[in-house]
Amino acid sequence: VSRITSGIINSFKRSAPKGLKTALWLIKITIPVTFAVMLMDYSGLLAAIAGVTGPWFKYLGLPGVSAVVLITSMFTNIYSVVAVLTLLDLPLREGMILATMCLVSHGFIIETAVMKRTGSSAIGINLVRIAGSIAVGVILNLVMPGSFSGIEKVYNPQQIPFIDAVYGWFSSVSVTVLKIFILVNILLFLQQLMEEFGWIKLVEKPLSPLMKIMGLPRSTTFSWVVANIVGLAYGSAIMIDQREKGRLTKDDAADLLNHHISISHSQLEDPLLFLTLGYTLHWLIWPRVIVAIAAVWFRRLTKTKSVHTPEYVTVN
């Protein structure tokens, strides 16, 4: 009992300062970024950007108004995407293709900051996500039953007073800040607890064959699991801590792990949100996993000989 109690206390002492530091870092990014996006949306700038890119979406079997959804997704989160898709009421096939693309390309500013801190190039990883999003759209347009309806929708968001827009932003960001503070600290405490009692190896060992298939080093296993369960923003504390402790080398994080999780992450909460629109869950998951695996192997095959590729060994 004393060993367990001591382990819990030690885990809390080690995780609390790191959890607070990471949570504050995320919050400092989240508040100004979300406010800027609110201003862009209110001013019509997001819609203007979408209007320029809209015509290209027909090649993915999507109406031009899809650009509004994807651009919104890149700057905001999946909750905003669900809100816009609800307003547009797209045909089911087109909605599912677009939703899966948004599951790849969303929250660019905040999530890119996380991946940059763990060793990736901000520009490079965003290009990977955009390419991955397009690849997912192409795949689904080819294999999903049905075809483009040809129905064009018009995006006419309801105009509200500016003070109401600010209030809506404040309400939303307050909830987000609270979730960041709570989840980041809980996750980091659980990680420290698992390290204290040697439980992380119990997670890594059974997943080792899967990690090899995906082209990922075994040392990335725990961060990969966290990113797939809670996403990049909330899981950032784990990834950053693993990086600082040397369990994730720069090659692991930047060249391999981030290439995968930038395309395929948060496989629980985010896809489930789209069930409210009647979308089928499996279409929202497997295309991202396949494209993410392809992205990692492509990266491994195209790395120059001067860049060391980590072997599948456990980093103690």
Predicted regions located by residue number:
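Hydrophobic alpha-helical transmembrane segments
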Residues: 27-28, 38-48, 67-81, 95-99, 119-130, 171, ...
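Selected transmembrane alpha-helices and immediately adjacent juxtamembrane segments
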Residues: 1-56, 130-211, 290, 306-316
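Juxtamembrane/interfacial segments around transmembrane helices
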Residues: 73-86, 121-128, 149-157, 178-185, ...
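Alpha-helical membrane-embedding segments
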Residues: 12, 79-101, 127-139, 159-166, ...
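Transmembrane helix-loop-helix hairpins in multi-pass inner-membrane proteins
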Residues: 105-160, 268-269, 274-306
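Juxtamembrane "helix exit" motif at the C-terminal ends of alpha-helical transmembrane segments
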Residues: 36-47, 80-85, 195, 267-276, ...
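Alpha-helical membrane segments and immediately flanking helix-loop junctions
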Residues: 63-120, 214-274
